[in-house]
């Protein structure tokens, strides 16, 4: 325990009321947030002579001072604790980093409703189906919906501009309501069936289609009956592949596995009795944290994160019981202003779903541990090769990407001892250099990365430069300048491509001595270097391609007199892209808002050359 903190003196001032406490280190950073029904009793437990928990010992050794906030009840304390954890992100708390909003399928309110991918605030009027675990699940579902129901998925601007059916109509993925190829009644019927399907009422949809097929057959409308038959067969095939519960309610099913410091919470999103998707979460867990705290922290942070646009069900099923479960139920119910229950002992369909979730969580942890051990071994070997006295905690790698000097982008990727740390990746749009000057691009990127570096900042132990001696020298010079007043600086290593750019033939160059050496092609340490180099290249080229496409779209249209950012955006949105604008007739261009007949002719002439 720090000599600067007098625990006995502090504890004499602490109330026995409910409340929240914040522990600070010598740098005045919050290192732990906790809550208690009895603050005096809880805080006293930290300063016993024999602390069994290693994590608690480490925490107490760093305490400089403690602040407490009294609350009216334990429920209030839980809510305030969650707010403080989100605000301070303390290093000794279990932290759930889940800042992405969840995607939905939107069925819009329109004369001819559309199905669309939606993420973010639900401002547009319509029905939202979800949440889905990720964007890929939504896109897969929309692709399936196109096969089952001929409902438009184009945006309203594109819909308004059509004078003839698009390709989706030709391949039977849309009924072309934009040009009157389907009656409003028939289109509305398909929208109704699609809505029922998204709610999980597959059998109701199939029954309705069977009735329609039989009615069409009685009227001898055999072509229409055949279309209904094909739709029924497609729906039955989909229904057979989906796991559905007899319980038609909404719930989240959470399987948990915690081993060797890695916790996985695998969630099944059950909506209307159907699995909408699943997603694994890996909260950051300080060493030696007990299972109860991991469970409590996850549930509290996941269901009280108001920044995320997520539909929260009334029921959550979880694989493990834990202390304070009922207190959490009450706190979350109060915060959400609706009934919220957490169940652990379940049977029938719920038990089946729970077994599935636990199996996935267990497999995920086993896989991650295997990967972690492999990466750890590679780090250890690299440390031995470089004869380092301290373990490598952070590595970064820079790469430059451009096409003949156009739209140059630099990437900086970050690896820690668990592999890629994608939240720390950065891209730099390179400006003001001679096109194709890789040395100048590297100089600008490294300068921007370390422009305001401080002793307490994120300093890599190893900094790889994807390039030869010239680029390495540029980077080394910048690092020497930026770190001249600091005790620590990164070790720079150039990764020069081998003969024929073949993997395994790379030459490594130390930045400080310019000594060159190579590793065996099957060396795990080389595989680690190749991994971070390849990841840096991938991240750079993706950024370059995006920037290049944006630049080309912008420059092609904005070079036309009278076309500014607003008109360019209107043209691209209305017609669907640059190629569509280039292929549009004057009559089609005039339909774009803000484009006159004279302007349309100018655009047409400029793009047709």
UniProtKB/Swiss-Prot annotation:
GO terms for cellular component: cytoplasm; excinuclease repair complex. Residues 16-94 form the GIY-YIG domain. It comes from the Bacteria. Keywords: Cytoplasm, DNA damage, DNA excision, DNA repair, Excision nuclease, SOS response. Interacts with UvrB in an incision complex. Belongs to the UvrC family. This is UvrABC system protein C. It comes from Shewanella baltica (strain OS195).
